[in-house]
Amino acid sequence: MPDELAEQMPVIKDVLRAMNIDIIEKEGYEGDDILGTLAKYGEKQGLEVTILSGDRDTFQLASDNITIRIPRTKAGKTETENYNRAKVLEEYGLEPVQLIEVKALQGDTSDNIPGVPGIGPKTAVSLIQKYHSVKELYEKIEKDEDDLKGKQKENIVANKDMAELSRTLGEIHKNV
C-alpha cells in the first residue's frame, strides 16, 4: 500500500465507523481475499451476491449466484456492466476460475505478478482454452503431448516456477 494511502487509513476507518459501515480486515490478507471469502460464504447461504469493483481480477469469483459489476465511463457517463459466469464464458471463452490460469501465464504488472515472458493476453487465453490450466499445460509438456514450438515453448518450460508463483499470487483466497 502506498504511504500516502496508509496515512489516510485511520481517517477512512473513522468516517466508515461514523456511517455505521462495518470494517472487516485480517492481517496478512488483501481486501480481495476478504471479499472473495464473504462472496463465497454468501453464495453458500443461498444468497445472490453482487460485487461492485473496478478490479477485473474479481471476475474469477463470478458464478451463477455471484455477479461482478464493473463501472466504466463512456462518453462522459459512468455505467456498470454485469459479469456473472455466463458473461465471463461469453467474453473470454473460459470459466471464471480459469482467469487465474490466464493471469499466471500473462502476468499483471499492476499487481506485481510476473507471468511467463513473451506470453501476452491472447496467447494466455488460447493456451488455457486448449490445456485448461497451468498444471495441465506443464503435464502435457512433460509427457511430450503438447504442440508448442520454438521460443514460446522454451519460455514456458524455462519459467515453470514463475508461472506457478504467478498463479498463487493471482488467486483470490476464498477461505480467510
Language-model features and meaning:
Residues 2-176:
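Extended two-metal-dependent nuclease catalytic cores across DNA- and RNA-processing enzymes
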